[in-house]
Design a protein with these regions (language model features):
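A short, conserved beta-strand element in the Rossmann-like catalytic core
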Residues: 13, 114-116
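Short phosphate-binding loop-to-helix
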Residues: 68-105
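Residues at the starts of beta-strands that form the adenosine-phosphate
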Residues: 4, 46-48, 73, 105, ...
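Short beta-strand-to-loop acidic/aromatic patch adjacent to the donor-nucleotide binding site
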Residues: 104-114
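N-terminal glycine-rich phosphate-binding loop and ensuing alpha1 helix
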Residues: 1-64, 83
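Phosphate- and divalent-cation-binding pockets in alpha/beta enzyme and binding domains
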Residues: 42, 59-60, 118, 199, ...
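Conserved core of the sugar-phosphate nucleotidyltransferase
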Residues: 116-190, 194
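Left-handed beta-helix
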Residues: 1-2, 133, 160-163, 172-275
């Protein structure tokens, strides 16, 4: 069964100062998720699912329908905002918000990250390798997953024999920090069979029992890490073989645009993606 690509596009963008999911970074107003979808369609994915917020529905729908929405079926799911909170419940809960649109294997990606064609291709091969492929993540070398300037948070992954053993959130990481050259991190590019949703729902209910605060989130790396710690050889780690770039802060715009300009000049992407 061809896999779905689930794109998480419900973030608030407080640090960025706007809707970074729709920040134009390429020719013709293309945004980062356009390049992820382009790579996905070349890698065997046959449907896109977007998790968004109600208040951004019109803007995102307009962008999608004028671009990749003309090439592939797109489903929309909504991550609702509780009245007691100022931000969504996090990336794991966002996946659960889309469960009705996921009827088979699927990949998860952020709307505001560029993963590189080799990473998307690796995930496509994994998900199409078996009717029940299991779970996987794409691991990036830390050095390939940091912005040019500034400090960020990264999910460091401990890998043994190609399997994820643990995942730990690190804060304040920058290019000035000392870290082992082989350190791998997750940039939230995951692949799952549909049974994963059952485990995720169970974890969500446990999370709620802990009476989370107004700023607490049910994050996908934490949810997957808890399951992987209890079940050895659960999550395969695939090598990215590409460099990440993304929109964490406004200072990242020029690096992202420069990266995409180089890739277009090398013939990796057409100048006009959807024409």
């Amino acid at each position: 069964m061809p896999a779905r690509l689930l794109i998480l596009a419900a973030g608030m963008g407080h640090r960025f100062g706007g809707l970074k999911q729709l920040e134009a970074v390429g020719p013709g107003g293309t945004v980062l998720m356009d390049y992820t979808v382009f790579d996905a369609l070349r890698s065997g994915f046959d449907r896109i699912v977007l998790v968004i917020r109600r208040e951004t529905e019109d803007a995102i729908h307009s962008h999608v329908e004028s671009g990749f929405g003309r090439r592939v079926h797109v489903d929309y799911a909504f991550q609702e905002l509780d009245v007691s909170r100022s931000k969504p419940w996090g990336t794991a809960q966002a996946v659960l918000a889309a469960r009705d649109a996921l009827d088979g294997p699927f990949a998860v990606a952020n709307a505001d990250d560029y993963y590189g064609a080799p990473a998307i291709e690796a995930m496509g091969r994994f998900l199409s390798s078996d009717p029940d492929p299991g779970w996987a993540m794409v691991g990036y070398r830390m050095v390939d997953a940091l912005p040019v300037d500034g400090a960020v948070s990264r999910a460091r992954v401990r890998v043994e024999d190609g399997w994820m053993r643990s995942i730990e959130e690190l804060h304040g990481v920058s290019r000035e920090c000392d870290f082992d050259a082989g350190t791998q991190v997750s940039m939230n590019l995951w692949g799952f069979d549909r049974d994963f949703l059952r485990h995720l729902e169970r974890g969500w209910q446990e999370f709620l029992k802990g009476e989370p605060g107004a700023d607490d989130e049910y994050a996908l790396p934490v949810a997957v890490g808890a399951i992987a710690a209890a079940t050895p050889n659960r999550v395969r780690v695939l090598a990215a073989q590409s460099r990440w770039c993304g929109m964490t802060s406004p200072a990242d715009r020029e690096d992202v645009r420069r990266t995409l300009t180089e890739l277009i000049s090398q013939g990796r992407y057409p100048e006009r993606l959807w024409e």
